[in-house]
Amino acid sequence: MAFRENVLEILEEITETDEVVQNTNIKLFDEGLLDSMATVQLLIEIEEKLDITVPVSEFDRDEWATPEMIITQLEALK
């Protein structure tokens, strides 16, 4: 499975909706799909499944606002 699909699969699992796959520009926090607890779960899943460590202190909500932005941020960390 391609990197992009892996990230979207993780997001779909955490948010419990396929809306993140259908609309990769959806504002995850504004729409209530991610909160602080879900963000921690997301970072743990990313580390476990993609072997990419994202320190919580480096997580900027504005830069991780949409699935598309998350994919871009993670590609930079690969």
From Swiss-Prot:
Domain of life: Bacteria
Protein family (similarity comment): Belongs to the DltC family.
A GO term for molecular function: D-alanyl carrier activity
Principal cellular location given in the protein's record: cytoplasm
UniProt cross-references to HAMAP family, sorted A to Z: DltC
Gene of this entry: dltC
Gene Ontology BP, a term: lipoteichoic acid biosynthetic process
Cellular compartments per GO CC: cytoplasm
Modified positions (O-(pantetheine 4'-phosphoryl)serine) in chain numbering: S36
Record's comment on post-translational modification: 4'-phosphopantetheine is transferred from CoA to a specific serine of apo-DCP.
Pathways per UniProt: Cell wall biogenesis; lipoteichoic acid biosynthesis
Protein localization: Cytoplasm
SUPFAM superfamilies recorded: ACP-like (SSF47336)
InterPro entries: ACP-like_sf (IPR036736), DltC (IPR003230), PP-bd_ACP (IPR009081)
Source organism: Listeria monocytogenes serovar 1/2a (strain ATCC BAA-679 / EGD-e)
UniProt KW keywords: Cell wall biogenesis/degradation, Cytoplasm, Phosphopantetheine, Phosphoprotein, Virulence
Coiled coil: none
Lineage: Bacteria, Bacillati, Bacillota, Bacilli, Bacillales
Function summary: Carrier protein involved in the D-alanylation of lipoteichoic acid (LTA). The loading of thioester-linked D-alanine onto DltC is catalyzed by D-alanine--D-alanyl carrier protein ligase DltA. The DltC-carried D-alanyl group is further transferred to cell membrane phosphatidylglycerol (PG) by forming an ester bond, probably catalyzed by DltD. D-alanylation of LTA plays an important role in modulating the properties of the cell wall in Gram-positive bacteria, influencing the net charge of the cell wall.
Name of the protein: D-alanyl carrier protein
Carrier domain location: 1-78
